[in-house]
Amino acid sequence: MALFDEYLKKGGFPELLTEKNIGKYIDSLVGKIINNDIVKRNKIKYKATLESMINHILNIVPTEISYDELAKLFNISSHHTAENYIDFAEKAYLISICKKWSPKSRVRVGSRKAYPIDVALMNNRKDAFVGDNLGYRLESIVYIELLRRTNPLNQSVFFLKEQRGEADFVVCEGNTVIEVIQVSYDISSATTRKREINGLLIGAKMTKCNKLTLITRHNQESFIENGYTINIVPVYDWLVDC
């Protein structure tokens, strides 16, 4: 438990186990990636704008993003440029983009959510102000692990969001949904527990999937709700259950 909590707060870069100045290390790493893997490789003219956008995204992850809104925020003439900047950041392994699940292709293409490729990038940069939101950090860790587990040839990870509620992740194999996952650091509040379970039930009905999982920091139980079996598992067990 203590080791996981350290990972949750520090991130997964091995160097951070011995690095005394974590902020300096992360700043240097991000700076090198932006300069060498993005700016030089793609001949970016407006480096400062690119850096500001990437830092902005890392400050608000995990969150839905809009290329039009980013273009307006950073005074970029075209949303295509904003889209390219985000694509460059993803290819350089600073962020990862998760698309919205929908039976309609245009919805999947049009909606997206950004995650950090490592939680160390969320709050250890000089321009960071995201703080220690453990719920966001836990959600990001689960997403990173889902990417590791899924086969890119026939499996995908999406998020689900509807007016009635939302589910953090929908895991698909081909066109079939094989699991709906919610992530919540603490479900001791009755309101939080109800919201997370409701998201799973909405996901189950929309996707016709019966495998429903709620990942938390330490809770563990299984029960039936509205005819569906819901499994609540502690994240440290889920992470080692390959």
Which stretches of residues belong to each language-model region?
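Amphipathic alpha-helical segments of the small helical/lid subdomains adjacent to P-loop NTPase cores
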Residues: M1-G12
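Active-site ExK catalytic segment of metal-dependent nucleases
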Residues: V177-S189
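Short, hydrophobic beta-strand segments that form beta-sheet elements in well-ordered domains
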Residues: N210-T216
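Cofactor-binding loop segments of dinucleotide-utilizing enzymes, especially the Rossmann-like FAD-
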Residues: V119, T216-R217
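Short, charged, amphipathic alpha-helix that recurs within catalytic cores of restriction-modification
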Residues: R193-K208
